[in-house]
Every structure is written in C-alpha cells, then in structure tokens.
Design a protein with these regions (language model features):
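Short hydrophobic/aromatic residue motifs in ordered secondary structure
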Residues: 44, 92, 190-193, 231, ...
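Membrane-interface helix/helix-cap signal primarily in integral membrane proteins
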Residues: 2-182, 531-536, 545, 591-608, ...
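Feature for secretory/organellar precursors and membrane-associated catalytic proteins
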Residues: 34-37, 278, 502
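Hydrophobic alpha-helical segments of integral membrane proteins
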Residues: 129-148, 155-156, 163, 171, ...
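Aromatic-rich juxtamembrane segments at the membrane interface
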Residues: 107-239, 244, 498, 548, ...
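Hydrophobic alpha-helical transmembrane segments in multi-pass membrane proteins
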Residues: 114, 168-358, 423-490, 582, ...
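Non-globular, low-confidence helical/coil segments that flank catalytic cores
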Residues: 55, 67-86, 97, 103-110, ...
C-alpha cells in the first residue's frame, strides 16, 4: 500500500500551511523555472528545487506552481527567480463527483500554489532547448488562431500542441458528451500519427532503420517536451521508441510487451498514475485492442488478430468475398467495441455517463482525424513560406472540425443519446473486471482447443458458435454493469438530503423514492458553481433529471448555478419544473429566471403556503412530502431574504426544515402562522448570519441538528458567533460545509444517518 500511496502524503510546506486551513500565507521563495504555461488570466510558472521561507521557518520544496500576472516580469525557462506572494494548498473535491485539484497536482509532484505579488530574476541563465520549444508552441498557437479564428484555431491548437487555453468550452463539452473528447487531447492516436509518419517518411527518403529511428525519436521527444509530456503522450513516446528499437535491432515488435513496459516505466516514476484518468484511459484503450479485439473478431466471424495464429484457407477465401467497405466497417466496429467495453469502468468512474452512439460516431471521426492533423501540420509549415499558400491547407482541418461539430449535433438530436449511470463503487468495478477476465479466459481456452482440432472435421462449426459466446457475454456484462450502477443509486429503503458545498451559497439535493428535487443553487465566491460543482455532483449520483427545482428567492448566491443548469440542459441535467414563491414576492431576478426557464423548455410554477408535493410509495402509502410553510399571501414582506420560500420535508417520523434566507422578520411570521413543527434537522437560514435562527424560532422548532452552508473564510464572517451560541444553547448539534464539505442526511423515516465528504460519519 505504501507503494501506491507514495507521493500522496503532504509535503512539509503543505503541512505548515494546513495549520491555518483556508488562509493565504505570506511566503518568499527561490527556485528555478522549468515550465511556463499561458492560462486565461494568469501565467502559470512551474518552479523546482525551491527554498521557501514562511515566517521564520524554511522549507525545501521540489516543485511549486506560481501564478503571475501577464504584465509582471518576463520570465524564461531556466531562470532562477525570487518570488514574494501568498501560498495556499490545493482544494480537495468538496462534493462527490467534483474535480479534486489536490490529487491532480500531487500526481505531478506539486503540493502548493503561490500567487505572486513580486517577481525578481536573480539569474538569467536559460534552458535554451526548452525555452525555444515553449516559444515555438506559443507562436504556433498564435498563428493557428490568426489563420482559423478563435474557435477553430483553439481547437487545432489543442489537437496539435496540447494547448487548451483557447479551446471553446461548449465544443469541449459537446465532444465529451458524444464520446469523442479524446480527439481534443494529445493521445496515442496523435503521437502515433506524428511519430510513425516522420519515421516512415525518413525511411522512404532512403535512411536506414538506425538513422531514421534516431532522427524520428529525437523529433518525437522534442515534440513531447513541447506539448507538456502528459501521461498519454509519454505512453505513446515509450511505445514508439520500443517499436523503432525493434526495427533497428531486427526484432519483432510485440504490442502487449511494449504496453507493459511503458506502464511499468510510468508507474515506477509516479505510482499515483494508477489512479489517473489519462493513464487508465490511454493504457486501457490499447489493452482493449490487445485483449478483447480477438474476442469480438471471432464473434463477428472475421480474423482473430493478436492470437498469433494464421487464418485457414477457407477463412481467407471467405474474407475475399467481402467488400472493402464491409471489412473496414467490421474492423472499426471490433476496435470500437473492444476499447469501449474495457474502458467502461474508468468512463463511468470519471465521467458518470455512457454516450450510447460513441461506438458508431468514432467509426466516422477517427479515420478522418489524420486529415485534420496532416492539414494542420502541413498548413503550418506552408504558412511560414506564404500565408496565402498555407491558409487553404489549414482550412481543410477547419472543415474536418466543422464536420465533427455537425456529427455531434446530429447525434445529440437522436433519442437516448446518453445514459447517466453515476459513479460506480469499487465493488462493482472489481466484479465487472473479474467477469471480463473470466470471459476472456474462456475464449482463449476455446480458441486453443479449436486450433488443435482437425479443421476438416465437422466439429469446426460447433467451435465457431462457441467462440462467439464470450463476445456476446462481454456485451451483456457491459449493459448489466451500466444498468446496475444506475439502479444502485435508487433509495429503495429511504430518502436522502444533501447540502452541497458551493462555497458562499446554497444548494440542497433531495433524492426521494421516485423523484429528485433541488432547493436553490448558486454561489457568490465559487465561479461557475452550476457546471463545476452542482452538475458533476448530480451526474455522479446518477441524476440526469430534476423533477422540481425550488428557488427560495432571487439572490445570486441562490440562483446563478440554476441559471447555468437551465442553459445547459441539452448536454447536462434536465429540469422539469421550476418552483418559486408567490408572484407578489417576485423581483426582477426571479422574473428573468422564469423567462430563462420557459425559453429552455422548463415549466415555471409558484408555490403558496399550504401547497405540497407528495410521493406515493405504493398501495396509497404516502412517502416523501414537501410542504410550503411560507411566505403567505398579503404579508408585508419585501422580495428577497425575508420573503424566502420555506419548505417542510417529512418522511415517516423524520422532519427537516429548509428556510432559505428568512432571518428574524420571516422567522417571526413563521412562528405566528402555526405551521412549524419540531424538526430533526434544520437547514440554518442565511448561512448562519447574525439575524437568523432566533431564540423564539429555535424554541418552537427544537431542531436536533443544524446544517450550515457557508464558504471557507468568507468575507461576511458566516456563520456568526452569536448564531452558533444560540444553536448550541438550544441543544442543537452544528455541522458546516466549511469543515465537512457535502453534508448528507439519510433516513428510512426512523433511523437518521449524517455524514460529510471530508469527514467520517458525524
């Protein structure tokens, strides 16, 4: 276990910063720049061999990432720099399904981020080769955008240079949702095209194996350094060098052996790659071709590549009768099925859904990808001679990307284009791959038995039938795995309410027995909370449709995430109904939200005091009930906090209260209207502000536990000390997203369980 956990432990500097979590600490550091990346608003400078001073303490940090402003000192790779700034640790995933920033950077050996206030170059010595490659990449990117425009130029830059800083976000999402997102990342497909293309070209010019191999390898190594040396590109580079080495030494190249050596080399360098999406997808794709390709080839009655056996004469004769198009289609389908079925586990684990048409879409897009890449490379070099010559060639690549857009849009219009299964647990993944391994074992056992039989015996037809069964079993196993994963998120025995960590804002997801509900969704300190925190959480929990989204009031920290969800329904989470307070309490923000909802096909409703939404769990038995307690019609309340929609959730003996931002005036009216009960759990109003959770309100509701949603080190000082004291005096246990991340309450109507994503059971 220590091998796989190597590098995951906090560095000494990170431990020092964690002594005051959430705070930015003033530091001074000296180190050598080894990499520079241009981002949207800042420049990321990667520094190695650093000495970091924090107060009176000094730490040696092998690698750091520093954000500097574009207008600050011009730094080059190899420079030794002295930087003053504020240091912080990377965020962990604070909701299920969210991006774990810390894990991502720790895999690269980086534990701390510094925001630079001042930068001083103390040595102008440069790494000439790396600096040249960095400048080449930057100028190449600028040329592509200048020739093709921001949209297609950014796409070509991502494909050729691995630079996604200008990649259109909607295009990236469109490709990912349709299962062709791998085309936008530098992968084995790209590296193989470039590496083998250069190698073959050099061989055709008359160079020998050794000369062509050395030259091709040197060019591909330089290219890998230029694009940032990601996991998939390193895998492709290692396998290319092994391939060329085999040619140079006159040996046969074995794909499986090459794959194993590449995996061993990368895992030895960084054991945490074993948990990296890029590593698993890159190696898994090749492993699928090696391991499952022969199984599906037998199922479709074609050749059995990778078995090391020759086809018999009758099979060769049969293949000659097939048209070239049919053979191409069968080969593409076999490859696509092999890759997708072996990668099903990582796809569900990291992306939570399966694009159902991706098998067929990849048959169309992969064969023409070399056209786009070839046009991009050739057009770039021709542009150096004359833009008038290079531009038409580059536009061939632009036309390919335009075609991809149209294919993805067409696929998105087809019914049932994606199946949201949620994030599978470890048990399901282990079971799936054990069954896959057993089916492959059965196939290879049967294949070897068949090869020992006399091919002229009548039993050969029986063998062909038997050899088709493992492939059918693999497809059935993949379907069952996907369906079982989704069904595993259904609450057969109870309901669940989760207070998401959206920073300084509010968002609560309720999963009933049959339907899904959301109460608010927004943040004032987390940008793109809808697409970065709320939607990934929902998809990871197998929620592709929200039946009711309740909006308590129109403040940005309660609705801006919902606005994102409404706009992105086509590729994200569908919203059936938007529920708002009575019309008289609407402000301009709520009216705009209603317009946005109706524009995107969502029905807008109002909920008055006394209205309720109830589920039935069979035989007329009432299940979850959400009842509106306020505001009542005709009350003298201003639109906003004090007129927040207040909801009472009941399920069996369980009671939970959601209060929006009501504060003292709204709480006073609730106490007077006589609808309040005693509650097991209170979702504290207004992030625990001073004016909320008054003594009278707590005396009436008598909550056993209070859940507070507030941002870490927020500027408002929420939750306020006075509020916490009142809650404690009322005998209430207090839990906050600041410490625990997502807070999840599960109940069967009697038993209640509470846990946080960053903490154990509470």
């Amino acid at each position: 276990m220590s091998f796989f956990g190597a590098g995951e432990e906090p560095s000494a500097l990170e431990m020092a910063l964690l002594e005051d979590p959430g705070a930015d600490v003033e530091v001074a550091l000296e180190g050598t720049v080894y990499r520079i990346e241009e981002k949207a608003k800042v420049t990321a400078v990667y520094v190695k061999d650093s000495t970091v001073s924090v107060s009176s303490r000094k730490f040696n940090e092998s690698k750091l990432m520093v954000y500097i402003r574009p207008d600050q000192t011009k730094i080059k790779i190899g420079n030794k720099v002295k930087i003053y700034g504020e240091a912080s640790v990377f965020d962990r995933a604070r909701n299920p399904g969210n991006f774990d920033q810390r894990t991502y950077y720790v895999r690269q050996g980086i534990h701390v981020l510094v925001w630079a206030e001042s930068v001083k170059i103390i040595s102008r010595e440069t790494d000439a080769a790396r600096q040249f490659l960095a400048e080449l990449r930057s100028e190449w990117r600028g040329m592509l955008i200048g020739q093709l425009g921001e949209y297609y130029g950014g796409t070509m830059s991502a494909v050729l240079l691995g630079d996604k800083s200008s990649l259109d976000g909607e295009m990236k999402k469109l490709y990912q949702k349709n299962g062709i997102g791998h085309l936008l990342a530098i992968s084995g497909l790209h590296m193989s095209f470039i590496g083998m293309g250069i190698y073959s070209l050099l061989r055709r010019t008359g160079l020998g194996f050794i000369s062509a191999g050395v030259a091709g390898g040197a060019i591909l190594i330089a290219y890998t350094v230029m694009i940032g040396a990601g996991v998939s590109s390193l895998r492709a580079l290692i396998m290319f060098l092994i391939r060329v080495g085999a040619d140079m030494t006159g040996r046969d190249y074995d794909l499986a052996t090459s794959l194993a050596l590449a995996a061993a080399a990368l895992v030895w360098q960084q054991p945490l790659y074993m948990t990296d999406a890029g590593f698993l997808l890159s190696f898994g794709a090749i492993l699928g071709l090696v391991l499952l390709g022969p199984v599906f080839a037998a199922m479709f009655g074609t050749a059995c590549p990778g078995t090391g056996r020759k086809k018999n004469k009758s099979r060769r004769a049969g293949n000659k009768k097939c048209g070239a198009a049919a053979r191409w289609l069968a080969g593409g389908l076999i490859s696509s099925l092999s890759v997708n079925i072996l990668l099903l586990g990582p796809i569900l684990y990291f992306y939570f859904e399966v694009p159902l048409y991706s098998v067929f879409l990849n048959l169309l897009v992969i064969p023409i990808m070399p056209v786009a890449m070839g046009a991009g490379i050739a057009g770039s070099f021709l542009t150096l001679i004359s833009p008038a010559i290079g531009s038409p060639v580059l536009k061939i690549g632009k036309a390919v990307f335009w075609l991809y857009d149209q294919l993805c849009s067409a696929a998105g219009m087809l019914p049932a284009g994606r199946y949201v299964a949620g994030k599978p647990c470890a048990g399901w993944l282990i079971t799936y791959y054990v069954i896959l391994g057993c089916l492959c074992g059965v196939f290879y056992f049967l294949y070897r038995r068949k090869e020992k039989d006399d091919p002229e015996l009548p039993s050969k037809d029986r063998w062909n039938i038997l050899l088709r069964l493992p492939g059918c079993g693999l497809m059935l196993c993949a379907v069952l795995m996907t369906v079982a994963c989704r069904r595993g998120y259904r609450n057969a025995e109870g309901i669940q309410a989760a207070v998401l960590d959206v920073g300084q804002g509010d968002c609560i997801h309720i999963r009933g027995r049959e339907e899904n509900y959301l109460i608010d969704g927004g943040s004032s300190d987390v940008s793109s909370a809808g697409s970065c925190r709320i939607e990934p959480y929902l998809l990871a929990n197998a929620v592709d449709t929200l039946d009711y989204v309740f909006v308590t009031h129109g403040d940005e920290d309660h609705i801006n995430g919902i606005q994102e969800l409404l706009k992105g329904q086509e590729l994200g989470v569908r919203i059936r109904n938007l529920v708002l307070p009575p019309q008289e309490y609407h402000d301009e923000k709520l009216e705009e939200l209603i317009y946005l909802a109706q524009k995107n096909g969502t029905r807008a409703l109002v909920m008055n005091a006394g209205d309720e939404i109830a589920e039935e769990i069979g035989h007329g038995t009432e299940g979850l009930v959400l009842k509106c307690l306020g505001p009542e019609d005709g009350q003298e309340l201003k639109p906003g906090n004090e007129a927040s929609l207040v909801l009472d959730l009941s399920y069996g003996e369980f009671r939970m209260l959601f209060t929006g931002d009501v504060e003292s005036r709204g709480e006073e009216l609730l106490c007077k209207n006589g609808r309040l009960e005693q509650y097991d759990v209170l979702k504290a109003a207004h992030h625990g502000s001073r004016g909320s959770s008054t003594e009278e309100f707590l005396r009436v509701t008598q909550p056993a536990a209070a859940l507070i949603s507030a941002g870490v080190d927020n500027r408002y000082g929420h939750p306020h000390e006075e509020t916490l004291e009142r809650l404690e005096a009322a005998g209430c246990r207090i839990y906050s997203t600041q410490q625990s991340g997502t807070l999840t309450v599960w109940t069967d109507g009697e038993i209640i369980r509470l846990k946080g994503i960053l903490t154990s059971d509470l």
